[in-house]
């Protein structure tokens, strides 16, 4: 018994020490930058490096993030989210969802929770797919920051998404393409955590996406990204038809 208690105390001490070191030596304050034309031009250069015009012409996408998979009808703002044992169709703009093959014993609150988490996963995981094309979204602020002698781009989202107020510092290569970014976001308590932007692939529509984001604590791979001009190029039948078949079955969340 004493041996087990000793192991427990050593484990707890190790966790506490690791947390202390993370906050003491890795937590960074949000850098200050200068807004203006130079920051906006750097943002446009970054967008051009991934062929943002091709992204605008991409009407449908599918990909995986961890154990979740997604289909996104970008033209109609609809999404299919598979997570855990759930399959959820989302009307993104109107915040309504439909649980495919739902358990009839689920309460309304449980259904709302399932749809809400599907939406949150879509917000996060679609952002990781291509945040570059969102640097001029309404509510964004772009600032030029000198980081280790290099000009970098700080983007703050003052509104929108599921976590407004988040900031990202883009570190670019000589062609303006992202090499990594540093995060100041509400879901990560340590400011300035850095993730790489590696393993770039070109989708069929011509847009470039990064599929590997290394960090010593948590590495994020994206799986099997596919981009098409239209959803009909991906599926013979419209997988979102059930969203519009019976409005009474839709769950607001």
Regions from the PLM with identified roles:
Residues 46, 71-74, 198-201:
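Extended lipid/amphipathic-ligand handling interfaces
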Residues 86-102:
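Interface amphipathic segments
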Residues 146-249:
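Gly/Pro-enriched, hydrophobic low-complexity segments
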Residues 54-91:
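Extracytoplasmic/periplasmic/luminal assembly and interaction segments
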Residues 6-66:
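N-terminal leader/targeting segments and the immediate start of mature chains
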Residues 39-48, 52, 56-61, 119-127, ...:
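Short, basic/low-complexity N-terminal boundary segments at the transition from targeting/disordered tails
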Residues 1-5:
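Short, Lys/Arg-rich N-terminal segment immediately upstream of the first membrane anchor
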């Amino acid at each position: 018994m004493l041996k087990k208690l000793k192991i427990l105390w050593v484990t707890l001490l190790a966790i506490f020490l690791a947390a202390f070191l993370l906050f003491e030596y890795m937590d960074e304050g949000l850098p200050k930058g200068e807004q203006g034309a130079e920051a906006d031009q750097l943002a446009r250069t970054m967008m051009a490096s991934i062929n943002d015009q091709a992204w605008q012409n991409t009407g449908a996408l599918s990909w995986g993030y961890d154990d979740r998979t997604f289909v996104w009808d970008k033209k109609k703002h609809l999404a299919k989210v598979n997570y855990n044992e759930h399959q959820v169709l989302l009307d993104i703009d109107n915040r309504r969802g439909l649980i495919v093959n739902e358990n009839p014993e689920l309460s309304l609150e449980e259904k709302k929770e399932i749809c809400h988490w599907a939406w949150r996963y879509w917000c996060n995981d679609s952002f990781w797919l291509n945040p570059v094309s969102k640097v001029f979204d309404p509510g964004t602020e772009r600032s030029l920051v000198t980081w280790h002698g290099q000009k970098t781009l700080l983007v703050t989202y003052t509104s929108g998404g599921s976590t407004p107020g988040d900031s990202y510092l883009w570190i670019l290569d000589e062609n303006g393409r992202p090499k990594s970014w540093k995060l100041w976001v509400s879901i990560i308590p340590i400011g300035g955590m850095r993730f790489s932007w590696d393993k770039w692939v070109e989708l069929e529509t011509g847009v470039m996406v990064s599929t590997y984001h290394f960090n010593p604590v948590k590495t994020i791979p994206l799986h099997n990204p596919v981009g098409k001009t239209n959803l009909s190029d991906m599926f013979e039948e419209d997988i979102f038809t059930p969203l519009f078949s019976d409005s009474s079955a839709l769950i607001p969340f």
